[in-house]
């Protein structure tokens, strides 16, 4: 009997590596291994792996202690070096769209395009003011230097990166399975970026990414640095919530002015121990229902570990297995 292919989906943050090894048997996904490994300060900064030796030690320990078997990885990226922009282009044949998007991408991306790897997903169709058909796309641009660093360091560790994908898109794919077709928004915060996206089915109607501003950086960083034991100061959590409240309220207001169909539900995603408190306080000031998504219920039924913090890892692993 041929060996069943598996792949490890992983996400790298400033403070830790999270990973899930996934396979597909008889049409169903199965978790083979799952775990995380803390990273020492300075190993990963601003999305870049700064200390390859210590990173290699950490990921080797994770693979060993978690009984991971595969050497193939799909990596989810979610930091300030990944830019997402919503754009519209005149509708053309599918085989011409890619060239059009890549030729005009610089108009939407505020960093020299030669420094970025650019991809896109089709986000629906509409018409402009002149009733001309338009194709909406979500542009995804990641710094080439960061991506090449990941590939080179994994290769030096005798690991192969088979795919690199956006964590935010991985979240969308997971939520599409549980949202019952409603128009939903995602609020996703990490230690260096705040993401918003509005989705219904396969149509994306807004995307916004904000680098955590200097006034909030220290508080947000402390909340995430101590996310597992909750040892952050209450004032840092309150400052983080205040920042989230301000940006989320303004984003919802802007979206409502630009769109006729309202957001029906908001999903809050963050890898902190304070998610429930954050959602509770946001809900006091935001009229749209907010909840923490319960990702992959069929997989959760076979796991004693909550899967929320591993959702991006699972999402990129599934995408890679599906090819």
Regions found by a protein language model. Give the residues of each.
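Hydrophobic/aromatic-enriched cytosolic interaction surfaces used to assemble or bind macromolecules
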Residues: 1-323
């Amino acid at each position: 009997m041929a060996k069943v292919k598996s792949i490890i989906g992983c996400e790298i943050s400033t403070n830790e590596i999270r990973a899930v090894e996934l396979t597909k048997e008889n049409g169903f996904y199965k978790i083979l291994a799952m775990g995380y490994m803390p990273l020492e300060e300075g190993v990963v900064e601003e999305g870049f792996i700064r200390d390859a030796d210590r990173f290699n030690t950490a990921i080797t320990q994770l693979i060993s202690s978690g009984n991971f078997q595969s050497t193939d990885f799909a990596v989810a990226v979610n930091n300030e070096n990944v830019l997402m922009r919503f754009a519209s282009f005149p509708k053309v044949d599918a085989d011409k769209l890619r060239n059009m998007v890549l030729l005009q991408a610089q108009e939407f991306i505020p960093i020299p395009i030669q420094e970025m790897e650019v991809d896109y997903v089709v986000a629906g169709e509409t018409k402009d003011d002149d009733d001309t058909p338009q194709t909406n796309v979500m542009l995804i641009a990641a710094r080439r230097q960061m991506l090449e660093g990941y590939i080179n360091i994994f290769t030096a560790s005798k690991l192969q990166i088979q795919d690199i994908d956006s964590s935010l898109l991985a979240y969308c794919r997971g939520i599409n399975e549980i949202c019952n077709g409603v128009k939903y928004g995602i609020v996703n915060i990490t230690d260096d970026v705040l993401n918003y996206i509005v989705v219904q089915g396969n149509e994306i109607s807004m995307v916004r990414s904000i680098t955590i501003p200097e006034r909030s950086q220290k508080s947000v960083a402390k909340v995430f640095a101590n996310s597992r034991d909750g040892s952050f100061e209450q004032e840092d959590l309150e400052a983080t919530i205040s920042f989230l409240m301000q940006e989320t309220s303004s984003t919802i207001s802007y979206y409502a002015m630009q769109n006729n169909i309202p957001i029906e539900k908001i999903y809050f995603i963050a890898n902190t121990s304070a998610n429930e408190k954050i959602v509770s306080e946001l809900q006091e000031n935001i009229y749209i229902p907010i909840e923490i998504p319960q990702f992959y219920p069929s997989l959760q039924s076979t796991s004693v570990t909550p899967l929320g913090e591993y959702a991006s890892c699972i999402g990129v692993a599934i995408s890679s297995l599906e090819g």
